[in-house]
Amino acid sequence: KETTSKKAVEIAEANEGSWAIVGLHPIQTTPDFHDEEVIGEGGKPFASKGEVFNKDFYRELAKSKKVVGIGECGFDYFHTNVDSYSVQEEAFIAQIELANELNLPLMIHTRDPKMGGVSPTGRSAYEDVHQVLKQYAKVQGNVHFYAGTYEQAKKFFELGFTVSFTGVLTFAKVYEEVVQAVPLDLMHAETDSPYVSPVPHRGKRCEPGYVIEVVKKIAEIKALPLEEVEEQLLKNAKRLYGVEF
């Protein structure tokens, strides 16, 4: 949203080795209350106001050399409120258009309905995100906090997108098959802090520095030397965001 995007740019500009991505998260597009079940372990409950994506505001923010992407944007179906689809779609397309205009990569948010929930389209969020990207996106990007299948991931790869994995890998074996299948040069490691801290930091507020635990787990799953995985993931980040460090 506008306030947090502005703050992210301020933090990035004040700290060497930090960059910012600016945009409007899909759950911020409708007025609602988001508790820990919705936002994830480690987050503080908050109320969204139903913000409209102001392209001029974000275009101005993106003039900073520290802004390296647009997002996170996409579809969040975790709520059963099927009426939110149209406003999420409108904000998503507007952010894709801005990314195209500025030639910046997209950070994609994709979340399926909770158990027993209903998708507003009858399809998975991954399918709907892919369909919109295929129609509108002229830039590449990353599908963050990836929790889809390898078959779904391949469709994103065909569009020039990568996927990223979080600390969930360290305690949920269900993702190991996907991690094993995804080529190392098409993935990233992330924390999604302050949420879902990896082992051995479970129960604590997640921090960006904990990403090393995700990298270690990827190396373990792929049976590769840690140094090789670290080197390739750094290359991937530099390639996607056009940064040097």
Residue ranges and their predicted role:
Residues 1-245:
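Mid-domain alpha/beta scaffold segments of enzyme catalytic cores
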